[in-house]
Amino acid sequence: GGELFIELGYDRLDDRFLPTKGMYSQLKYTSSRESLGADLDFDQIEFSIYGNHTMGRHNILFGGVFNTTLDDDIPIYGIYTGGGFLNMSGYEQNSLLGANFGMVLAGYRYEVAQSGFLPGYVGTTLEYGNAAAKRKDIFSDGRVNGSVYFAYGTPLGPVYLGIGWSEDRSAVYFLRFGSVFGANSLGRR
């Protein structure tokens, strides 16, 4: 590939790993050009937004992703993927594929242990979206899914252990270490 891009980001989360308040947003325009070594000329727009609000031990998470390809023909490296924790949690990582990807989510997390070496949380999410060849099919042919999980904040980063579910598949189990917020985790290609 050969791409030029411009990216705008806004990050006011109080913690990259287990945030309790703030917002994260990213907007990116990518122009892939044959003159730069790409297989095909194509353009893509990616947008994501996530927010957190805490009241005592209760935390609310909300967010969404909308990634779209502006051209009809793209090479395989330009395809968006979905699946995995907080990115269509009811599906295996990278199991949803398409030239376009979008999802919305709402989540709740409860702080079980407020102090100590390993603060613990239990949470759940409800997510809706899909990957599709056509932009209009992302939400019109969307899939309901979500997760139930335990999270622990460790000195090396958070550990998430849980189960994802969807309306058309059996359960997906996950164990995840590290950040779930940011360009390399949520709304990734």
Predicted segments with their positions:
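C-terminal outer-membrane beta-barrel translocator/porin domains of Gram-negative envelope proteins
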Residues: 1-120, 124, 132, 175-182, ...
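Acidic/histidine-rich, metal-coordinating catalytic segments
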Residues: 127
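C-terminal beta-signal and terminal closure region of outer-membrane beta-barrel proteins
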Residues: 135-189
